């Protein structure tokens, strides 16, 4: 008879009977009684009153009975901590039992009893088990240390268990090694700064040796540990990859994904032009494809991970697109994932196959899948320009099916295609308008309204179409209302005489009858714009639209890099970092991809998580591309006594918050105007997306002896009709100066000098007019010191410290660019308190930390600290670790950004390691350049 009989009893008063049976002299009776107790406990009955009687049954040689008693103990020890102490002697005795299975069982149960009162009694038995002659006992004891650490971390450290764990990494048994690694990794997760694992080439070699002989779980533990190691160079990275690659052919999909994670991380360190790099990319494809032949649930997990891999390195699977074609019997969750990856892999070479598949999918019966397929056709058109016409034709065929949800989704994606390829496919608008009456979804209605408004001049009855939407204005969603408002304003600007009544009607509905603040605000903006300056309104509302990006749903680069570090875990399925869904008392250590140390000369950007990925993204909406155009379009009239600024024009532009609006209306400050009449600059709110990053602040200063970059020629005479300008930037008495030398190499004299800066990353502008009062005669030079401040408008530049300047004289207007060395923007109050420094360092995410090498520097730590302090870089603390001098430093920029630094100096080694952390990591490479310049001059 099976053990199910223990779960079928309905007796009353059975506790008393069980108590008697537990104390029976016969072993079999006691064993039966314990089974009944466990069964009662399993179904939720309270049998805690039997605790002392069950504990008495521990004194037995029967392994099955001992397991049952231990199970009972684990369940009730927390609610009966005082009685749990009764079992301590039995644990100690069992840990010395000749049977290794009993020793291991005892130590495993010890780790599972989470009672503070008895942990101290368990230290000695655990210490013996960690050095036990039997590997099964040692591997069980290793896991017990991690469990004990979670209960009482301080005691584990004091008792030296962590050192014992580290010793087990060199154990002769691979499973002991794997469990020791698993335990140390878990402890390290909760104490990220402890460096418990102490990964070095020797330990890594031991782990790789154990890898081949472990069980599947052991291999996963070791591979996960390897993924946290940063090899010292690409040769070591390649060596590890060669020994991990065989795991790709493992039968267990978890082992395969763990191996892929290691290889994806180490690919960052391999030179991209090497044969091995390309060979490794080819080796990664087959195992990923094989994962898609498993069960649907395994396929889904594999596809979610492949989605990340394809975003990071699409070249791995670019030849394997057919395996992502949907099968008729795939579950919907697998179909949607495959569809997403298909689009990511779509290219000119395979677009015909992809489109044929998508058209077929669009005739399926599953509504969600069909919608996604139609949307995918639009994404193909946007991504692969050569296929756009074929995609539009396919969408028109689908619209002809008259299936409601297909038509609506098709109209939404055609709107995006119009945005991507303006004035190319407008001939299909008539076909779209035929389906107006069938549109009942907000997205589709908004898309159709946008199309009618954008191409109103090509649609004869555009006013009637928009008026039909206006009839139920208050019943529409906010999205449709906003789109309709803009569309009617566009229509009015294109056909003012015919639509005046219509535009007044929609403005009245938006501003007077609506409770939605967004709608009201937009209505008021349009109303004031139209009534104040219709010409400007036309320029604003009908301006050329920025192109839409090819991939709108790519994961943000730094998050993608973090998720690559979590391949094979729940984070890679959710596409969220662990701290977004795991609550822990210690928090979660953020991971990031290793930094390639191939090039660290001054001026080079580190190939890190932030810098590379941002540079690789296609920049569709320009952030500074038109800025030089802004300077070129400046209307520079002759110098006047008082600079005129058109308040009406500037007001209109400010109202619309244009981040790229031109500098028209901001006249030059001529040199003839006395400083007292110069307009005082006011901080401008610029819609550039950087206001939070670059908060404008005042107060700058530099200690005497600060570094000054050598003068450079900014404007050669051959490009400026004989005017040559060279210069640099300095800090004196707490002010920033632009030190310039003007040389006249022309044959005529020069007068009426004026200067203006374009918007820049730090809001740098002249504090006073350019003061050159006497004519500059041929072959004459003059030195000019122009005071600057940081109160001007902010616009992110590329590079970040780029400054675009316009200089005018009686001959012409000339333009040049120069780079501001960031040390002139370091402020005097950049010294942090020690506690604040420590808290801030921990608070800034680890992916924001970038490392650089400062080469060929022969200064000691004190000299370095003194030199940097002269430039407002303050040393907060200094300590010596294993012969290395560690300087912890802080500095602050004029816009309020704090940068924290750790500088490692090894006496006798001319190469210093600089680690920088700040909330705006794009600044770090420029700070590194400043460090390099200061310490080498």
Curated annotation (Swiss-Prot):
User: Which residues are annotated as modified residue N6-acetyllysine in the UniProt record?
Assistant: 265
Q: Name one GO cellular component term.
A: cytoplasmic side of plasma membrane
Give tissue specificity per the record: Expressed in the brain (at protein level).
Q: Could you tell me where the Polar residues compositional bias lies?
A: 607-617
Q: Which Pfam families match?
A: Adaptin_N, Alpha_adaptinC2, B2-adapt-app_C
- Sequence positions bearing N-acetylthreonine: 2
Q: How does it sit in the membrane?
A: Peripheral membrane protein
Q: Where in the cell is it found?
A: Cell membrane; Membrane, Coated pit
In the record, what terms sit under GO molecular function?
A: clathrin binding; protein-containing complex binding
Matches recorded under InterPro entries: AP_beta (IPR026739), AP_complex_bsu_1_2_4 (IPR016342), ARM-like (IPR011989), ARM-type_fold (IPR016024), Armadillo (IPR000225), B-adaptin_app_sub_C (IPR015151), Clathrin/coatomer_adapt-like_N (IPR002553), Clathrin_a/b/g-adaptin_app_Ig (IPR008152)
- Chief subcellular site? membrane
Supply one GO BP term.
Answer: coronary vasculature development
As stated in the Swiss-Prot or TrEMBL entry, residues carrying the post-translational modification Phosphoserine are 4
Keyword vocabulary terms for this entry: Acetylation, Cell membrane, Coated pit, Endocytosis, Membrane, Phosphoprotein, Protein transport, Transport
Ranges for the region named Disordered are 593-617
Q: Does the keyword Zinc apply?
A: no
Point out residues bearing the modification Phosphotyrosine.
737, 928
Functionally, this protein is described as follows: Component of the adaptor protein complex 2 (AP-2). Adaptor protein complexes function in protein transport via transport vesicles in different membrane traffic pathways. Adaptor protein complexes are vesicle coat components and appear to be involved in cargo selection and vesicle formation. AP-2 is involved in clathrin-dependent endocytosis in which cargo proteins are incorporated into vesicles surrounded by clathrin (clathrin-coated vesicles, CCVs) which are destined for fusion with the early endosome.
Q: How does it assemble?
A: Adaptor protein complex 2 (AP-2) is a heterotetramer composed of two large adaptins (alpha-type subunit AP2A1 or AP2A2 and beta-type subunit AP2B1), a medium adaptin (mu-type subunit AP2M1) and a small adaptin (sigma-type subunit AP2S1). Interacts with EPN1. Interacts with EPS15; clathrin competes with EPS15. Interacts with SNAP91; clathrin competes with SNAP91. Interacts with CLTC; clathrin competes with EPS15, SNAP91 and PIP5K1C. Interacts with LDLRAP1. Interacts with AMPH and BIN1. Interacts with ARF6 (GDP-bound).
- Family the entry assigns: Belongs to the adaptor complexes large subunit family.
Q: What is the recorded name of this protein? A: AP-2 complex subunit beta
